[in-house]
């Protein structure tokens, strides 16, 4: 894959044809190291069906790269209540062969721009595992502030130690998509 500085990164709505991508992302033990392990085929199909039905409160996009718009991951945002306040939460996942090229950061920056333009909530949060250095680096690069470290239940029934990164969507925009 080409370097992300010259590689075009974009997002598009999640579609029925993205199930094999989701199976690779969520069914791979290495990809799910920080998230409680791989999901079962039934859970992946259930999640895929949800991803195909965007709503005002949750949207998932395929991350696409290059002129051929090859799907290499997902990025999304959904409503969450944090300390009694409604906010956006964001998350992302990129295939191993496409990691380390800035693709996840650039795709997440696009989602942040959309959330900012929508103006619904002041804050967007991300909750990567404290051990997930690449995802924590994306938060830092995109201008999130480390709010606190805490325990987070994900998936249901599995507690993980995570960082609560927060970005003020109403603050002046930094040049995060360099």
Task: Give the residues covered by each predicted segment.
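Acyl-donor (CoA/ACP) binding surface of acyl/acetyltransferases
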Residues: 1-27, 34, 60, 64-178
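A short helix-loop-beta-strand connector motif used in the catalytic cores of GNAT acetyltransferases and
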Residues: 50-62
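Juxtamembrane/interface motifs at transmembrane-helix termini
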Residues: 41-45, 53-55, 66, 94
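Short, charged/polar low-complexity linear motifs in solvent-exposed/disordered segments
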Residues: 39-41, 50-52, 89-91, 165
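Conserved GNAT-fold acetyl-CoA-binding loop/helix
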Residues: 30-50
């Amino acid at each position: 894959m080409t370097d992300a500085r010259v590689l075009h990164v974009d997002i598009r709505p999640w579609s029925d044809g993205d199930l094999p991508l989701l199976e690779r992302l969520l069914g791979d033990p290495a990809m799910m190291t920080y998230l409680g392990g791989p999901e079962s085929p039934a859970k992946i199909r259930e999640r895929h069906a949800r991803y195909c039905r965007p709503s005002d409160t949750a949207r998932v996009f395929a991350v696409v790269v290059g002129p051929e718009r090859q799907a290499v991951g997902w990025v999304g945002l959904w409503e969450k209540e944090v300390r009694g306040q409604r906010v956006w939460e964001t998350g992302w996942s990129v295939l191993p062969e496409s990691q380390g090229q800035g693709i996840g950061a650039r795709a997440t920056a696009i989602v942040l721009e959309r959330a900012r333009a929508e103006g619904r909530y002041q804050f967007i949060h991300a909750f990567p595992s404290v051990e997930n250095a690449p995802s924590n680096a994306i938060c830092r690069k995109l201008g999130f502030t480390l709010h606190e470290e805490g325990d987070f239940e994900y998936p249901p029934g599995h507690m993980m130690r995570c960082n609560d990164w927060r970005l003020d969507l109403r603050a002046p925009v930094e040049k995060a998509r360099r």
